[in-house]
A protein has these predicted regions:
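Short, charged, solvent-exposed linker or helix-capping segments at domain edges/interfaces
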Residues: 100-105
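Non-catalytic interaction-recognition regions
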Residues: 1-99, 110, 114-595
Length: 595
């Protein structure tokens, strides 16, 4: 039997619809959906097929729904089909169809839910890409978790996924990092210069003052002694030291960022250097490609309304015809002095991803970059002749609270809560799951107290507890005097007829929606759907557990009922497998027991 009963039923609904209305076009049929009903009293699934087809067929949707229900009611997986509302058809699965999915889950194991909707399409998911000028903070954390979970759910749905980090190792912020690291070096060798004096003496100002650069200064001191300073331990000419200081600072910052990502459970496959792209001539090549397409011209943009962008100037610039691809205004690529804009560098980077074979590009950005979306989509459309879509997932700000009050400061970073602070406080699993309990474009509060609470209000505890309970039942069965079989292969052959309680069937209904959930989350680029699903699944299992405490006939292990015990163990094992599969997508550990 197929893993995805919703896909099976959609195929049958479409078959019936085509038999009734052979004139329907593929585009019209593509709009047919089979979805879970909101109220189980109305059945297990509902389809909009009659409402989709009624208008082009010139029929009444309610009458068409009645005809479809009559055709579908005889299907072997269905116990019934009824028209509903203005033209929906509610479908009720047979108990045999529900029970038949338990062996499917047990035989598939954690691969249950693996799909083919991605069809091997090559997707590049770029996320985090934090400037290597300091430790990762809470905002980077959300983007890292969202991007990583998105990549995982898309891979499970059948896409070929590459995960990537763009290292912004060129430009003004890296220059400022070099100067800030040099100040920490001067401190390490005993220079009397103060922060205020150094700030006034540098071209960038002292922009990064957190303690995290102290180890960089110490490393420079150990490597070079006082050779990078003046004889009186003052600021030497940058030609003497700047490149060496910047390179060591960048290397140490990227090492720390990689360590933070590893602690968070994020391991990206590709790290692309902005500076390497610039040095390879990629920007010139990308601009030349646009020029060959007739999309470059010299001109002066109208003064912008409101806040003036960094790349606007009242002089001729090299401009990209972004308005031809849906943007509000044309965009500068080169300034009047001949230097490239940051947009030009980003064009080169995305052109490189296209050249490496990406068929879909997904960038996960902070919401503060929302104004950049239209220009990047425009230029990717231009570069790829519309073949490669660029999708942007925006992550809103995260507020950390404790005791109802905001937590703002990190001693080490100076001005923000670092990822390391958060991981030390509540652990990786709580961080990852909590970050996915809101849609990425919604602001969220991360409550430190709730993240460690052993209550239903803490979603990671609630879901891990359900898995731990499943595992405890299976261990108890293994260690019982009767030593019931708990291997998936054996349980897949169990007689499941004893599973007839409404709560047992409700749990099965939740389990069988997992393949559809994976497909939907991947196509919508919404990994938070997995977290919501797991929370609801855990709730169904906990309800069954609690019901068994009050009704002895629903207890999982009953020495006098071997057949019933095997059936319930099969259900418990299937539940554990689906929870484990979902937690893998989220990058969260499935707990064997709660401590």
């Amino acid at each position: 039997m197929s893993q995805n009963l919703f896909a099976v039923m959609r195929d049958h609904v479409v078959e019936a619809l085509r038999a009734l209305l052979p004139q329907l076009t593929p585009e019209q049929v593509a709009r047919v959906e089979v979805t879970p009903t909101r109220d189980p009293a109305h059945g297990d699934m509902a389809t909009n097929a009659a409402m989709v087809a009624a208008k082009p067929a010139g029929q009444n949707p309610r009458s068409l729904a009645q005809s479809l229900a009559e055709r579908r009611g005889a299907h072997p997986l269905l116990a019934g089909a009824e028209p509903a509302g203005p033209g929906f058809v509610n479908l009720r699965l047979s108990t045999a169809a529900l029970l038949g999915q338990i062996p499917v889950i047990l035989r598939a194991g954690e691969a249950y839910g693996d799909g083919s909707v991605g069809a091997g399409v090559r997707v590049n998911v770029e996320y985090v890409s934090a400037n290597p000028t300091g430790p990762m903070h809470i905002g980077h954390c959300r983007g890292a978790v969202v991007g990583d979970a998105l990549a995982r759910v898309m891979a499970k749905a059948g896409f070929t996924v590459t995960t990537e980090y763009y290292v912004n190792d060129a430009g003004g912020q890296v220059q400022a990092l070099g100067w800030a690291a040099y100040w920490r070096y001067l401190q390490a060798i005993g220079s009397p210069i103060t922060a205020e004096e150094f700030d006034a003496a540098t071209p960038t100002g002292l922009q990064y003052r957190g303690d995290y650069l102290i180890p960089v200064g110490q490393a420079l001191s150990e490597q070079f002694g006082a050779a990078l300073a003046t004889p009186d331990l003052g600021v030497a000419e940058p030609d003497l030291w700047f490149d060496r200081v910047r390179e060591l600072a960048l290397s140490m910052m990227m090492t720390e960022i990689r360590e933070d990502l590893a602690l968070l459970g994020v391991r990206q496959e590709v790290f692309s250097s902005e500076r390497a792209l610039l040095e390879s001539g990629a920007v010139d090549r990308a601009i030349a490609t646009l020029d060959e397409k007739g999309l470059i011209y010299e001109g002066v943009l109208e003064p912008p309304k409101g806040k003036t962008p960094e790349d606007w100037e009242p002089r001729p610039q090299t401009l990209f015809r972004a308005t031809e691809f849906g943007d509000d205004v044309d965009r500068p690529l080169r300034k009047s002095d001949g230097s490239n804009t940051y947009f030009a560098n980003d064009i080169a980077y995305h052109a490189d991803k296209i050249a490496r074979g990406a068929e879909v590009m997904i960038d996960v950005w902070g919401a503060d970059h929302g104004g950049y979306v239209s220009r990047m989509k425009a230029v990717v459309k231009a570069l790829s002749d519309g073949r490669v879509p660029l999708e942007i997932v925006l992550c809103q700000i995260v507020h950390v609270i404790r005791g109802g009050q905001p937590v703002r400061m990190s001693k080490r970073a100076g001005t923000f809560v670092t990822l390391r602070d958060l991981l030390d406080e509540v652990g990786r699993d709580a961080v990852r799951f909590t970050m996915l309990m809101r849609k990425s474009d919604a602001q969220m509060e991360f409550d430190l107290d709730q993240a460690v609470a052993q209550t239903r209000e803490n979603p990671v505890f609630y879901v891990q507890y359900a898995h731990a309970r499943c595992r405890s039942v299976l261990r108890a069965a293994r260690d019982s005097p009767g030593a019931a079989a708990i291997e998936a292969t054996a349980l897949a052959e169990a007689d499941l007829s004893a599973l007839d309680d409404p709560q047992e069937l409700a749990l099965i209904r939740r389990l069988i929606s997992w393949p559809r959930l994976v497909e939907g989350a991947a196509l919508a680029r919404e990994p938070h759907r997995v977290a919501f699903f797991l929370y609801d699944l855990a709730g169904e299992f906990h309800m069954l557990w609690n019901k068994g405490r009050d009704d002895s006939t629903l207890r999982f292990l009953q020495a006098e009922d071997v057949v019933g015990t095997s059936a319930r163990l099969a259900l418990v094992a299937a539940t554990a497998m689906v929870i484990r599969s979902g937690l893998f997508v989220l990058g969260v550990t499935p707990a064997e027991e709660m401590r």
